């Protein structure tokens, strides 16, 4: 038997027993500070949410140790029988949530889900038609700085200037002129429901594959508060966080078996190696939660809260893009107030309200400045906020923007910050975490 004096620390117990606070107090302090920030601030970033403790536990589990290249039952490594269970649970729950035949839960992000679809059905130089970033689309839909705008001939459609809704006449004209191999719907800053049927008709007319990126509204679809794009599209991609309220990750869905096989090969071995099994376990937990009746109530409240906040912003004298929202997010045009999105974001954060500066349709300002902000209701709704709280939030936003426009927002920021702290104290998250 080995002399205990020479037993490595990993076998002596320290490696498996010493926690983060002792092992790395500097990092532990930063995590604790972030927990405190999340507790005391109102989160309005539309792409963020708050996961359950169960999701946290799954994502922080020992599944992080396991490599599992391949798919359940067809792995390239041994010892995968239990991680196979986790992935199979995630797949079956995703299929049930979205009423579809096939799901790939391995993409590490929404961007990689889109990249996987491109790898599966396109070749470099093919033409894609997607919503421009300026109109509310996403980088991966053909924006020039993104790989999708470099590898493909990316044509971009936008919104109508009079109402900021998708310009389907333009979509149809561009589709017929360019004959794209793929048409993409969905975006990161479009607050209205999308006519998927109209998009599919245009795609069929030109022989294009129709892809819907539902990263922002997938949770609304899962809970029945938004039309299901899989009733019309060939392929849907999504993140697994945002309104779906799971860990950060991606997913690809389809009803076409031939496409599903191509997608699986495109993800592995096409663009990824071993999947993140601890994250896939977190996805499985979140999908299980989304199948519960309470999730339907949650997403209905998300939409109602977003509408209440948008209406309160209008009442406060702010210009709401498209005059409202059908989803979880709203865009505020600050040009009539003479305030930039960058300044509004900073002032709101000083008041403990977190949002993001965002371009608006036909924005004259650069993306580092912007003329608007994007606000969303998912995280606040998870905390328990209802219409009353979101009306108050919209009022606070209006007060701070007005104070900025008048040249000095310090006093208003200080007052709102204390009021926000009082509100968040009534709706705590993660008892025992943060201060």
UniProtKB/Swiss-Prot annotation:
Q: Where in the cell is it found?
A: Cytoplasm
Cofactor(s) recorded in Swiss-Prot or TrEMBL? pyridoxal 5'-phosphate
The record ties this protein, via Gene3D superfamilies, to:
Aspartate Aminotransferase, domain 1, Type I PLP-dependent aspartate aminotransferase-like (Major domain)
Q: Where does (6S)-5,6,7,8-tetrahydrofolate bind?
A: 133, 137-139
Pfam families registered for this protein in UniProt: SHMT
An MF annotation (GO) of this entry: pyridoxal phosphate binding
Q: Which GO terms describe its cellular component?
A: cytosol
The free-text function statement in the UniProt record for this protein reads:
Catalyzes the reversible interconversion of serine and glycine with tetrahydrofolate (THF) serving as the one-carbon carrier. This reaction serves as the major source of one-carbon groups required for the biosynthesis of purines, thymidylate, methionine, and other important biomolecules. Also exhibits THF-independent aldolase activity toward beta-hydroxyamino acids, producing glycine and aldehydes, via a retro-aldol mechanism.
Q: What family does the Swiss-Prot or TrEMBL record give for this protein?
A: Belongs to the SHMT family.
Quote the subunit structure annotation. Answer: Homodimer.
Name used for this protein in its record: Serine hydroxymethyltransferase
């Amino acid at each position: 038997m080995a002399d205990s004096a020479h037993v490595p620390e990993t076998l002596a117990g320290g490696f498996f027993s010493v926690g983060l606070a002792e092992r790395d107090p500097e990092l532990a302090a930063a995590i604790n500070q972030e927990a405190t920030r999340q507790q005391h601030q109102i989160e309005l970033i539309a792409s963020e949410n708050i996961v359950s403790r169960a999701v946290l536990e799954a994502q922080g589990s020992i599944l992080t140790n396991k490599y599992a290249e391949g798919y359940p039952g067809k792995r390239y490594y041994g010892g995968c029988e239990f991680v196979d269970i986790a992935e199979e649970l995630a797949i079956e729950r995703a299929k049930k949530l979205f009423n579809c035949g096939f799901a790939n839960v391995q993409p590490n992000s929404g961007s990689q889900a889109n990249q996987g679809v491109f790898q599966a059905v396109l070749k470099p130089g093919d033409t894609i038609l997607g919503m421009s970033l300026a109109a509310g689309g996403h980088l991966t839909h053909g924006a020039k700085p993104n790989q999708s705008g470099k590898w493909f001939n990316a044509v971009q459609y936008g919104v109508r200037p009079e109402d900021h809704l998708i310009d389907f006449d333009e979509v149809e004209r561009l589709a017929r002129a360019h004959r794209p191999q793929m048409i993409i719907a969905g975006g990161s800053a479009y607050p209205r429901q999308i006519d998927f049927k109209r998009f599919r008709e245009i795609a069929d007319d030109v022989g294009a594959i129709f892809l819907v990126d539902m990263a922002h509204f997938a949770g609304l679809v899962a809970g029945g508060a938004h039309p299901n794009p899989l009733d019309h599209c060939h392929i849907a991609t999504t993140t697994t966080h945002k309104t779906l309220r799971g860990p950060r990750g991606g997913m690809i869905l389809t009803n076409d078996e031939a496409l599903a096989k191509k997608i699986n090969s495109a993800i592995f071995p096409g663009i990824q190696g071993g999947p993140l099994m601890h994250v896939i376990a977190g996805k499985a937990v979140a999908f299980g939660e989304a199948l519960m009746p309470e999730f339907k109530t949650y997403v209905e409240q998300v939409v109602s809260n977003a509408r209440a906040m948008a209406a309160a912003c209008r009442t406060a004298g702010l210009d709401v893009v498209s005059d409202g929202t059908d989803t979880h997010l709203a865009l505020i045009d600050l040009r009539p107030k003479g305030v930039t999105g960058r300044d509004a974001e900073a002032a709101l954060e000083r008041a403990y309200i977190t949002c993001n500066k965002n371009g608006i349709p036909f924005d004259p300002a650069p993306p580092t400045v912007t003329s608007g902000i994007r606000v969303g209701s998912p995280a606040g709704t998870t905390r328990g906020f209802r219409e009353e709280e979101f009306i108050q939030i919209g009022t606070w936003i209006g007060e701070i923007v007005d104070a900025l426009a008048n040249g000095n927002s310090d006093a208003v920021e200080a007052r709102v910050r204390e009021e926000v702290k009082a509100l968040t104290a009534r709706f705590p998250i993660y008892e025992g975490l943060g201060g």
